[in-house]
């Protein structure tokens, strides 16, 4: 009967009943025995499930010249009946004096290669190399945003637990939904995006995330926090979501820290806290103004690992009203409940620390101010200057 209720809610877009926290098998349960699993080439396959889901491959760039960029392929299936694909690109204006360069374009004649490792469409190719260590993204889908980028993994990728997936449903053997994240937290980026005005050199560092929401997004999560932190030596990632009351408002947090070419820590014992917020009149949500992120766990050799980012976020980089800006197929999935209002608050900051572990703060428009990164491995403390991209998402 619970399966039937969930199916009806998925098809009709209605709010789900209260199943309770026992109806989500969090990936944190896997991580108790297997904190993380390094990705192989086969793990990078597109799933293309034949039921309601949204599958994304998202690439974040933090260029050496300070430019922050996101490019993304979205593959969506609605009720096993209709599939759609979209290509998004966004060049952020960190000064705040001009609009961001944001394009979201439908894809036509899209397909996967026979191994489900690469994706193509008219005027678009997202290709994984033979070694499984680099993606090339080439897009002429929009003449105002010509993309030619290569992301080369410089540290191992990982999923938390055995498969990076939390499962939803009252019968663990037959889940009716899922949520998966896989990370390449540290990449070398080469290439450009060319607009009508200029060509952006995007040489620098990046992160790649493969994500699958195997159910309607507003059924899986009501809140999200995402942190992407890059320094010359370290990368840290955190993806946290809180389920709706249907699943007990359960918090699931996956993330990790890498240094150069090795994973220092990855697991599910992390936290993200909005330590201060301000009411956003347009969205009617408490937009975060300060955040504290903590990574806690063990290194491969059994040392305690503790990392922390704590401080003000500075001026908001952007507020995206998803219902106003995303294509219709995403609205159909994310907004089929009357009153659903997803908002994504995006913040880009420069981060710096130096010497001993000292708290520093910076807003995105004031790079001389600093925010503190604290990293402790065993008895050793480390700190390093870098950059952060953060998102806070609210869905009701």
From Swiss-Prot:
InterPro entries in the cross-refs: AttH-like_dom_sf, Ceramide-binding_SVF1, Svf1-like_C, Svf1-like_N
Membrane topology: Peripheral membrane protein
Principal cellular location given in the protein's record: Golgi
Gene Ontology CC: cis-Golgi network membrane; cytoplasm; endoplasmic reticulum membrane; nucleus
Location in or out of the cell: Golgi apparatus, cis-Golgi network membrane; Endoplasmic reticulum membrane; Cytoplasm; Nucleus
GO biological process terms held by the UniProt record: ER to Golgi ceramide transport; response to oxidative stress
Key words, A-Z: Cytoplasm, Endoplasmic reticulum, Golgi apparatus, Lipid transport, Membrane, Nucleus, Transport
UniProt GO molecular function: ceramide binding
Entry-linked Pfam families: Svf1 (PF08622), Svf1_C (PF17187)
General function of this protein: Ceramide-binding protein that may transfer ceramides from the endoplasmic reticulum membrane to the cis-Golgi network membrane, and is thereby required for the biosynthesis of complex sphingolipids.
Family per record: Belongs to the SVF1 family.
Name under which the protein is recorded: Ceramide-binding protein svf1
Gene that encodes the chain: svf1
């Amino acid at each position: 009967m619970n399966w039937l209720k969930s199916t009806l809610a998925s098809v009709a877009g209605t709010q789900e009943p209260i199943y309770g926290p026992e109806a989500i098998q969090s990936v944190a349960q896997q991580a108790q025995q297997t904190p993380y699993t390094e990705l192989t080439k086969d793990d990078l396959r597109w799933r293309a499930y034949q039921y309601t889901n949204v599958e994304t491959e998202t690439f974040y760039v933090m260029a050496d010249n300070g430019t922050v960029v996101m490019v993304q392929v979205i593959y969506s299936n609605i009720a096993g009946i209709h599939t759609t694909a979209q290509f998004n690109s966004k060049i952020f204006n960190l000064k705040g004096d001009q609009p961001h360069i944001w394009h979201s374009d439908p894809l036509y004649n899209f397909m996967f290669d026979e191994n489900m490792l690469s994706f193509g469409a008219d005027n678009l190719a997202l290709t994984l190399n033979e070694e499984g260590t680099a993606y090339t993204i080439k897009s002429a889908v929009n003449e105002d945003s010509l993309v030619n980028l290569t992301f080369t993994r410089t540290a191992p990728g990982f999923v938390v637990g055995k498969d990076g997936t939390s499962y939803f449903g009252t019968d663990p053997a037959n889940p009716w939904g899922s949520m998966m994240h896989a990370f390449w937290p540290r990449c070398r980026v080469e290439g450009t995006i060319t607009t009508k005005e200029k060509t952006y050199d995007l040489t620098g560092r990046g992160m790649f995330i493969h994500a699958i929401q195997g159910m309607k997004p507003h059924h899986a999560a009501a809140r999200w926090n995402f942190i992407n932190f890059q320094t010359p030596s370290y990368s840290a990632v955190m993806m946290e979501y809180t389920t709706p009351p249907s699943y007990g408002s359960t918090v699931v947090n996956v993330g990790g820290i890498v240094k150069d070419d090795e994973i220092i820590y990855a697991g599910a014992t992390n936290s993200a806290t909005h330590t201060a917020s301000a009411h956003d009149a347009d969205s009617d949500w408490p937009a975060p103004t300060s955040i504290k992120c903590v990574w806690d766990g063990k290194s491969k050799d059994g040392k305690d690992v503790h990392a922390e980012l704590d401080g003000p976020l500075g001026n908001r980089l952007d507020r995206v009203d998803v219902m106003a800006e995303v294509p219709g197929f995403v609205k159909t999935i994310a907004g089929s409940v009357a009153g659903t209002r997803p908002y994504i608050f995006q913040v880009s900051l420069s981060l710096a620390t130096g010497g001993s572990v000292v708290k520093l703060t910076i807003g995105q428009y004031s790079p001389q101010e600093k925010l503190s990164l604290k990293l402790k491995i065993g008895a050793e403390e480390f700190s390093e200057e870098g950059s952060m991209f953060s998102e806070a998402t609210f869905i009701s």
